[in-house]
A protein has these predicted regions:
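Hydrophobic transmembrane alpha-helices of multi-pass small-molecule transport proteins
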Residues: 56, 60, 129-154, 290-309
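Loop-to-transmembrane-helix transition segments
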Residues: 14-22, 66-93, 164-172, 225-248, ...
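Glycine-/small-residue-enriched transmembrane alpha-helix faces in small-molecule transporters
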Residues: 2-46, 92, 136-142, 154-188
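Helix-helix packing/entry segments at the starts of transmembrane helices
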Residues: 23, 47, 87, 104-112, ...
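C-terminal transmembrane-helix exit sites in multi-pass transporters
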Residues: 59-63, 113-138, 274-293
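Transmembrane alpha-helices of multi-pass small-molecule transport proteins
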Residues: 38-89, 114-120, 174-182, 199-220, ...
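C-terminal-most transmembrane helix of multi-pass membrane proteins
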Residues: 2-3, 49, 149, 234, ...
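Specific transmembrane alpha-helical segments of multi-pass solute transporters/efflux pumps
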Residues: 25-30, 61-106, 110, 146, ...
Length: 312
């Protein structure tokens, strides 16, 4: 486990701001299926990650030779499995969980990410003791409970899901927890490579891996035929998601991960849920319910509590 360097007040503010902005971009991912409803989740995933790889390759090209000299076989191997854990495997688990157990159950399980990352981060050398993080964890858990209750009520109690679906959701939770923790620890020990460059290299690796998804997604799919206008819209959506959610969002997240203690970074993941909810309210043209407002307030309160604990 790496030792977390002391975080100055300025670094704390900049890191938290980067984490919040990352969440605002990541929240847009949940609107993509609404914009191109005729395409499957596998096609959206393959398209997004292929676009991510192309954009990342173009942006990292000027620094490619220097990075090749800086990175050894160990770093490239790490990039490969981080790309699998944080992107490819994570999404495949989520897609199968939604298919087998329903979106409500999946969202509730994935919503535990802030808690799992924070708990793992609390074991790092130099991290705050868990008792000082207890208030933020309790606030986050209460917020997630509100979301779960609201989701179950909206689904009229039919959100139990099958055992395979629950297992896949748990797999997604483990996959992204491993990614968040390992990525943060690697960023802390990297020398001569910026957080943004590491994000772009992850994109290049993810794009290469997405080629394997493209075959079943586009060549073997038995789906509806799409016209030129639909494909053009699809291309626009996946490239927008790649640029804003993957390149900008992941770059900002890596900056936060490199600047902040892992326990605090874990709490910032809630902003993906918060912004996704706000975008959903705007898309559905409705006001949040009382439980939804309570959930958002509790989730933000958990982050504020965690940040305050790290200032003391």
């Amino acid at each position: 486990m790496h030792a977390q360097a002391p975080t100055s007040s300025t670094d704390l503010r900049l890191g938290i701001g980067a984490g919040i902005l990352a969440g605002s971009f990541w929240g847009l991912v949940f609107l993509a299926p609404e914009l191109v409803p005729g395409f499957t989740p596998l096609q959206l995933s393959a398209g997004r990650y292929l676009a991510y790889g192309l954009v990342a390759a173009a942006l990292v090209a000027p620094s490619w030779r220097r990075l090749l000299r800086r990175l050894g076989w160990r770093e490239w191997r790490t990039l490969a499995w981080l790309s699998l854990c944080g992107n490819i495997v994570y999404y495949l688990f989520v897609a199968q969980a939604v298919h087998s157990g329903g979106g409500v159950m999946t969202a509730i399980v994935i919503g535990l990410l802030p808690l799992t990352v924070t708990l793992v981060g609390s074991r790092d050398h130099g991290a705050l003791p868990l008792r000082r993080l207890t208030p933020s964890l309790l606030l986050g858990a209460a917020g997630l409970a509100c979301i779960g209750w609201q989701s179950l009520a909206a689904g009229k109690g039919n959100a139990g899901g099958s055992l395979p679906g629950l297992a896949c959701a748990a797999g997604a939770l483990v996959s992204w927890t491993v990614y968040a923790v390992a990525n943060s620890r690697w960023l802390a020990r990297l020398d001569g490579v910026t957080a943004h460059e590491w994000s772009l290299l992850t994109g290049v690796m993810t794009g290469a891996q997405a080629l394997l998804l493209a075959v079943p997604a586009f060549l073997l799919a038995d789906g509806a035929q799409h016209g030129a206008a639909e494909w053009l819209r699809f291309g626009g959506v996946v490239f927008a998601v790649a640029i804003f959610c993957s390149v900008l969002g992941n770059g900002l997240w890596n900056h936060a991960s490199r600047t902040l203690p892992l326990a605090l970074t874990g709490q910032l993941i809630v902003f993906e849920t918060i912004f996704a909810s706000l975008y959903a309210f705007a898309w559905e043209a409705r006001r949040p319910t009382g439980l939804e407002i309570a959930a958002l307030v509790l989730l933000v309160g958990g982050v504020v509590s965690c940040a305050s604990a790290h200032r003391k």
